[in-house]
Curated annotation (Swiss-Prot):
GO terms for cellular component: CBM complex; cytoplasm; cytoplasmic microtubule; cytosol; immunological synapse; lysosome; membrane raft; nucleoplasm. The modification N-acetylmethionine is found at residue 1. Ubiquitous. It is linked to A chromosomal aberration involving BCL10 is recurrent in low-grade mucosa-associated lymphoid tissue (MALT lymphoma). Translocation t(1;14)(p22;q32). Although the BCL10/IgH translocation leaves the coding region of BCL10 intact, frequent BCL10 mutations could be attributed to the Ig somatic hypermutation mechanism resulting in nucleotide transitions. Immunodeficiency 37: A form of primary combined immunodeficiency, a group of disorders characterized by severe recurrent infections, with normal numbers or an absence of T and B lymphocytes, and impaired cellular and humoral immunity. IMD37 is characterized by hypogammaglobulinemia without lymphopenia, but with profoundly reduced memory B cells and memory T cells, and increased numbers of circulating naive lymphocytes. Inheritance is autosomal recessive. This is B-cell lymphoma/leukemia 10. Changing residue 41 to Q: Abolishes NF-kappa-B activation and homo/heterodimerization. Plays a key role in both adaptive and innate immune signaling by bridging CARD domain-containing proteins to immune activation. Acts by channeling adaptive and innate immune signaling downstream of CARD domain-containing proteins CARD9, CARD11 and CARD14 to activate NF-kappa-B and MAP kinase p38 (MAPK11, MAPK12, MAPK13 and/or MAPK14) pathways which stimulate expression of genes encoding pro-inflammatory cytokines and chemokines. GO terms for biological process: adaptive immune response; antifungal innate immune response; apoptotic signaling pathway; B cell apoptotic process; cellular defense response; cellular response to lipopolysaccharide; cellular response to mechanical stimulus; immunoglobulin mediated immune response. CDD domains: CARD_BCL10 (cd08810). It comes from the Eukaryota. It comes from Homo sapiens (Human). The gene is BCL10.
Amino acid sequence: MEPTAPSLTEEDLTEVKKDALENLRVYLCEKIIAERHFDHLRAKKILSREDTEEISCRTSSRKRAGKLLDYLQENPKGLDTLVESIRREKTQNFLIQKITDEVLKLRNIKLEHLKGLKCSSCEPFPDGATNNLSRSNSDESNFSEKLRASTVMYHPEGESSTTPFFSTNSSLNLPVLEVGRTENTIFSSTTLPRPGDPGAPPLPPDLQLEEEGTCANSSEMFLPLRSRTVSRQ
């Protein structure tokens, strides 16, 4: 169900018309001849005879028009009656358009203001939802910190290691807790240099002598075999 559009009350419309007269005061004081509208305004009970006499006491046309606008602002129907009088005169219809445009402009501004107040008063979440959301975020943060603290382990070197889901190196796809076993496997499968290879440690003296003796007699060990093979043929 769509929300209803805001509407202006009678008080709002009266305020709009009063503001329109105030905004156009300088312009209307130059264009309006107050005496031309006395009869119609008195017939509609907008002005009294005393009011017209008070207006007529002003020394200039602009001052008389200004005093007339003062009386019209005090009456909720003052502006409407002035427009009717101008229409009856048929000589200043451009004033009607000017007044109408100003009233419509102020009316739209008032409606936008009321619409903004209505939107700001609407709660996007149910009562207490914002508090519950902030409380939930706080609980999750506390739980995460506690979980992180409970899973941290320290190696002899002082390096810290956390559980697999806190590991930042996801490309390895290896649990952090198994790093030690993985390293052991790598080191155990690496081939060590053999005696005599570059980088191999020197052999003890007794092993060197034994190895040299073995190499010197290797040809003699195979001679009897070859001699026996030849004799059989």
